[in-house]
Structure formats: structure tokens, C-alpha cells
Swiss-Prot record:
Gene: ndhA
The protein's name in its UniProt record: NAD(P)H-quinone oxidoreductase subunit 1, chloroplastic
One function term, GO molecular function aspect: oxidoreductase activity, acting on NAD(P)H, quinone or similar compound as acceptor
Superkingdom of this protein's organism: Eukaryota
The entry's keywords: Chloroplast, Membrane, NAD, NADP, Plastid, Plastoquinone, Quinone, Thylakoid, Translocase, Transmembrane, Transmembrane helix
Catalytic activities: a plastoquinone + NADH + (n+1) H(+)(in) = a plastoquinol + NAD(+) + n H(+)(out); a plastoquinone + NADPH + (n+1) H(+)(in) = a plastoquinol + NADP(+) + n H(+)(out)
Length: 363
């Protein structure tokens, strides 16, 4: 009887330890995800504030100044306002598609952050097809916009959804061809490998210098994918009121608002990763990675430096995107499609052909 009791106690202790280990593993898995979500949230708030301040400077007016110091809490005030607004549904629309559309758009963009390396060994999912996984995931977002436009039962919303789908298809192909050229140069489709392939010669090792044509095409295609001026035809106020967002209010409208900035941040991060060397300091002949690997404190410091460098390069592209918004006029729909199919697609195909030829000759 004593032996049986001892065995039962040992088994119970073993199961308790196993349960604690499972809980610990779950917590350890959730910590980086929650940290990434917190970082993304802060990044979006900073982008909104920067856009308001830069736009005010370009237009020679005063930007937000009442919501917190220097108006830095303006985005938080806007989000709170949208959160407490009434959530209206169209009486004759498809309420299921109407409600699911914004969620699909936001979720597909959020999943793109899984393959982005923010620093040395700081990525949630280092998969061998990282860049193409991003393209596949981001291709789902236009489906959500089309569902939103169709479910609204509004001609302006439906036309805006159709424009969003057509625009995404037109510019997704040149963007994919540019990414394929980068993969050929790096001999890998992993985002981490692409960054490390640019670290050999510092600043001169960036793909920006080896792929200048691809960089310009990728830049234009990224702006078009984000539906930023001069490519904001799905939301053209003068023609479509607000496009696929016309019938939305409250938190659902806020989701579209967040999705646009999330997409802009994703595009900026991928410009940094694919063309600007990612987390690398970009100074040749300086063995900083070796210095950062000396001890644990060095690794932590190196990770922080890498995150700072990545974000600095990212916000440089964001500044260009925001400045472009107030510099160039909106294109017509035919001009937008002609630019994508008649100019960017042949140029990106030619760039891919040149890259493939150079790689074959170097073998």
C-alpha cells in the first residue's frame, strides 16, 4: 500500500511538472508575438503622427498640437473616437461579407510581419520561402476589400473594391518579379539570408546598387500596393466618396484606417530588408558582429543596435512615401493600369532577364 501511494505521488508530481513545462512553453511562445504586436502598435502610432507633422510642414501650417505634447497622442485620440462611434450596417447589403472584409484585410497584413527580420536572429519565422510567403499572404488583402465593396450594396463601394483588386493585381506582378531578382542574387528566398548576403561590403553591398532598376520598380509598386497618392484611386474622394469604405463607421472603419498604415509599414520594412541591408550597420571593414558575439551583453546590445538601424532605414522610406503624397497628383485609372502593365511589367521582366544572365555567366 505504501509503495502504491509513493508511485501515485511520483506520477502526480511528474504530470504537474509536465503541465508547468507546457505552460512555460506557451508563455515563452507568446512573449515574442505580444512584443511584436506592441512594437507594431507603437510603430503605427508614430507613423500617423509623423504623417500629420510632415504634411503640415509641407503645407506650411501647424499640425496636431492639443492631444499630448507636440500632438503625439493624436492617433490615440482618433482611435478612441472611432472605437466609441456607432457601428452601422447597410440594410440591404450582405452583412457577413461586410463584417468579415476589414478583418481579412488587417489579418493578412499582420501575418506579413512574421517573416520580417528586425535584427540579428530576431525574426519570428525564418522560413526558406520568406519573401514569397509575404507575397502570398499580402495577396489575400484585396479579397477582403472586394468583399467589403460587394457587401456594402453601394455602387461607390463596389467600384472602389473592383479598383482595389485591379490595382493590386496590376502591381503585384512587377513587385514579385523584383523580389525574384533579389532571390537570384542572394541564392535564397529567406529574408535573413537576403540581409546577410548584403553584409559583406557594408554600404556598397546593398542590393540598391546591384538592382537600381528593380529598386525603382519595387518602390513604385509598393506605393501602389499601399494605395497611397498618387495611387489612391480605390478611395478617390472626388469620384467615389470613400471607395469601399463609404458605408463603414466605428471600429470597422478604424480597421481600414489601421490596415493602410500597417501595409505602409510592411512595405517600408521590406524595402529595408531587400535593398538597404536590413539591420547591418553598413560600414565596411568593421567586425561589429564579432564584437556583439563576445558575451550575452554584447548580443543584447547588438540586437538593440540592429533594431534601431532597421527602423531608421524604414522611416526614411516612410518619409519619401509621405512626401510623395503631397507632391504628385492622382493618376487616372487608365494611366494607373498603363503604368503597371505597359511600363513596370516589361521593365521588371527585363531586369529579371539581366539578373538571370549575370548569375549564369558568373557560374
Amino acid at each position: 500500500m505504501i509503495i502504491d501511494t509513493t508511485e501515485v505521488q511520483a506520477i502526480n508530481s511528474f504530470f504537474r511538472l509536465e503541465s508547468l513545462k507546457e505552460v512555460y512553453d506557451i508563455i515563452w511562445m507568446l512573449v515574442p508575438i505580444l512584443t511584436l504586436v506592441l512594437g507594431i502598435t507603437i510603430g503605427v502610432l508614430v507613423i500617423v503622427w509623423l504623417e500629420r507633422e510632415i504634411s503640415a510642414g509641407i503645407q506650411q501650417r501647424i499640425g496636431p498640437e492639443y492631444a499630448g505634447p507636440l500632438g503625439i497622442l493624436q492617433a490615440l485620440a482618433d482611435g478612441t473616437k472611432l472605437l466609441f462611434k456607432e457601428n452601422l450596417l447597410p440594410s440591404r447589403g450582405d452583412t457577413r461579407l461586410f463584417s468579415i472584409g476589414p478583418s481579412i484585410a488587417v489579418t493578412s497584413i499582420l501575418l506579413s510581419y512574421l517573416v520580417i527580420p528586425f535584427g540579428y536572429r530576431l525574426v519570428l519565422a525564418d522560413v526558406s520561402i520568406g519573401v514569397f510567403l509575404w507575397i502570398a499572404i499580402s495577396s489575400i488583402a484585396p479579397v477582403g476589400l472586394l468583399m467589403s465593396g460587394y457587401g456594402s450594396n453601394n455602387k461607390y463601394s463596389f467600384l472602389g473594391g473592383l479598383r482595389a483588386a485591379a490595382q493590386s493585381i496590376s502591381y503585384e506582378i512587377p513587385l514579385t518579379l523584383c523580389v525574384l531578382s533579389i532571390s537570384l542574387l542572394s541564392n535564397s528566398s529567406s529574408t535573413v539570408d537576403i540581409v546577410e548576403a548584403q553584409s559583406k561590403y557594408g554600404f556598397w553591398g546593398w542590393n540598391l546598387w546591384r538592382q537600381p532598376i528593380g529598386f525603382i520598380v519595387f518602390l513604385i509598386s509598393s506605393l501602389a500596393e499601399c494605395e497611397r497618392l498618387p495611387f489612391d484611386l480605390p478611395e478617390a474622394e472626388e469620384e467615389l466618396v470613400a471607395g469601399y469604405q463609404t458605408e463603414y463607421s466605428g471600429i470597422k472603419f478604424g480597421l481600414f484606417y489601421v490596415a493602410s498604415y500597417l501595409n505602409l509599414l510592411v512595405s517600408s520594412l521590406f524595402v529595408t530588408v531587400l535593398y538597404l541591408g536590413g539591420w547591418n550597420l553598413s560600414l565596411p571593414h568593421i567586425a561589429l558582429p564579432f564584437f556583439f558575439e563576445i558575451n550575452k551583453a554584447g548580443r543584447v546590445f547588438g540586437t538593440i543596435i540592429g533594431i534601431f538601424i532597421t527602423l531608421a532605414k524604414t522611416y526614411l522610406f516612410l518619409f519619401i512615401a509621405i512626401t510623395t503624397r503631397w507632391t504628385l497628383p492622382r493618376l487616372r485609372m487608365d494611366q494607373l493600369l498603363n503604368l503597371g502593365w505597359k511600363f513596370l511589367l516589361p521593365i521588371s521582366l527585363g531586369n529579371l532577364l539581366l539578373t538571370t544572365s549575370s548569375q549564369l555567366l558568373s557560374l
